[in-house]
């Protein structure tokens, strides 16, 4: 005779309705049954460590100094006015940065932490896009590549709009992937929303949006009306941005791009995408990174070529770079590595396709991630691979004890104005000073035929990492023209004179 026992709930606890669980319990079971989420969590944790641990290590460079020293003002309205006149991008990043700095401040760590958040958020977004378009394994591999990439870490530690462009382009690419896979019209709409936000961050989001829109039009014939309507909405936003873009272009912020040869810019593209902004510091490190990179590329092509999603990711990545190159033919020269940095996302998804090759694929991706982390650490410990250290240069110059003119090295006017308290730029006219400090990059050619103004005598020479400077003083303040001061420069490159009054 069998005996049936009935289990009872623990004292003081009510039984849960069948099928209903707590949020924490659901998450715990999901983690147990989905090791993919554990892998993603570990990858995100590694990405956080790489991005947040060294936020304050490097000085602001020239463009970051513009962000914190000129664009971000006490009022949001004044900030938008500075974006209009001082920047070459739409205002979305600066609105978010203005809000962020109300809480976290304008220091290197304070404002860059916003970029680090954006950079970290990009990692799971790329996982989502990769697993949707190619495979779950490819999504994990792509997320790992983005987490470890020196280029992605670099922009995640920069107080500029590029990392928000990367994040929003990744979100748009994710919705694009879902739209292609599920063939759902609402996903096309969400793709358009993400694309508009990317455009409001940076005009060059269009380089990714155009090939994605064409792909949606071709691949989703049953949704073409939705694709056309969504593309028209994006085009309307582009039209609304035209007056701002034209005004900013007339300020000449990007004219320097065309002064760099196309071949040199292609070289920069490879160096910056693979090794970080300043390239590799040694031939050994170059080989350590390039060998697994080439292996990953070959294995990805071999293992995933038959996958339509993989081919689509590779095509979007290549076309994001190709669109501005094609525009150059028509006289619109915007091609520069950071202007096509959003291509890193679909290319990472394509690279993640290497794991389709059993064992060798995962080995290649793991080796490439290890090489990327090695390169990122090398940047942290090698000053010449970092941003120019204007912060230490300002410390070496010391506080101004008398009215002085500081003749900065090329690109140094904005960061020196920021780090030298009470300083401002002077482009013309005359100044009254009793000290002249002239600064140059250590590696720059030094002018030997210089004219020291009458009444000034040599008072010493100093240095800081990456810079040298000379100081000339006078027994009394003397009035000099900006033109006369330019004859004292150590470097032949022109940079505005900085006037600093003692406090």
Give the positions of each predicted feature.
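Short, intrinsically disordered terminal tails adjacent to the first/last structured region
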Residues: 1-33, 368, 501-503
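Membrane-proximal helix-loop-helix interfaces that form the catalytic/acceptor-binding platform
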Residues: 3, 31, 35-503
């Amino acid at each position: 005779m069998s005996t049936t026992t009935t289990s009872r709930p623990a004292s003081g606890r009510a039984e849960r309705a069948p099928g209903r669980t707590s949020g924490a319990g659901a998450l715990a079971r999901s983690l147990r049954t989905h090791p993919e989420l554990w892998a993603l969590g570990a990858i995100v944790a590694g990405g956080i460590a790489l991005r947040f641990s060294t936020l304050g290590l490097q000085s602001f460079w020239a463009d970051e100094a513009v962000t914190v020293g000129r664009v971000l003002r006490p009022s949001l309205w004044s900030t938008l006015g500075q974006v209009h006149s001082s920047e070459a991008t739409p205002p979305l990043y600066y609105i978010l940065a203005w809000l962020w700095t109300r809480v976290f401040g304008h220091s290197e760590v304070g404002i860059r932490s916003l970029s680090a958040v954006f950079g970290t958020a990009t990692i799971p977004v790329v996982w989502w896009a990769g697993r949707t378009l190619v495979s779950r394994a490819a999504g994990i591999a792509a997320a790992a590549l983005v987490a470890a990439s020196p280029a992605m870490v670099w922009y995640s530690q920069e107080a500029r709009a590029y990392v928000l462009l990367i994040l929003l382009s990744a979100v748009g690419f994710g919705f694009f992937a879902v739209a292609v896979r599920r063939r759902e019209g609402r996903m096309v709409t969400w793709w358009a929303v993400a694309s508009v936000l990317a455009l409001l961050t940076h005009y060059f989001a269009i380089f990714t949006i155009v090939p994605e829109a064409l792909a949606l039009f071709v691949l989703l014939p049953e949704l073409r009306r939705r694709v056309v309507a969504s593309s028209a909405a994006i085009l309307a936003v582009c039209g609304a941005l035209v007056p701002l873009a034209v005004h900013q272009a007339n300020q000449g912020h990007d004219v320097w791009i065309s002064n760099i040869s196309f071949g040199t810019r292609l070289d920069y593209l490879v160096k910056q995408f693979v090794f970080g902004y300043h390239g590799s510091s040694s031939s050994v490190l170059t080989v350590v990174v390039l060998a697994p990179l080439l292996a990953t590329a070959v294995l990805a092509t071999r293992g995933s070529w038959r996958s339509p999603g993989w081919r689509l990711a590779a095509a979007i990545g290549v076309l994001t770079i190709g669109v501005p190159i094609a525009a150059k033919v028509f006289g619109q020269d915007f091609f520069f590595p950071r202007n096509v940095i959003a291509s890193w996302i679909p290319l990472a998804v394509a690279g993640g396709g290497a794991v389709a090759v059993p064992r060798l694929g995962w080995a290649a991706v793991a080796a490439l991630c290890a090489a990327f982390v090695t390169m990122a650490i090398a940047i942290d410990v090698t000053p010449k691979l970092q941003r120019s250290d204007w912060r230490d240069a300002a410390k070496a110059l010391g506080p101004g004890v008398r009215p002085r003119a500081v003749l900065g090295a090329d690109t140094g006017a904005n960061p020196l104005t920021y780090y030298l308290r009470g300083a401002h730029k002077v482009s013309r006219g005359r100044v009254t000073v009793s000290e002249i400090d002239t600064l140059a990059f250590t590696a720059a050619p030094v002018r030997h035929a210089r004219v020291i103004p009458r009444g000034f005598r040599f008072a010493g020479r100093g240095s800081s990492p990456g810079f040298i400077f000379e100081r000339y003083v006078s027994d009394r303040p003397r009035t000099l023209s900006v033109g006369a001061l330019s004859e004292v420069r150590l470097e032949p490159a022109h940079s505005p004179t900085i006037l600093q009054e003692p406090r």
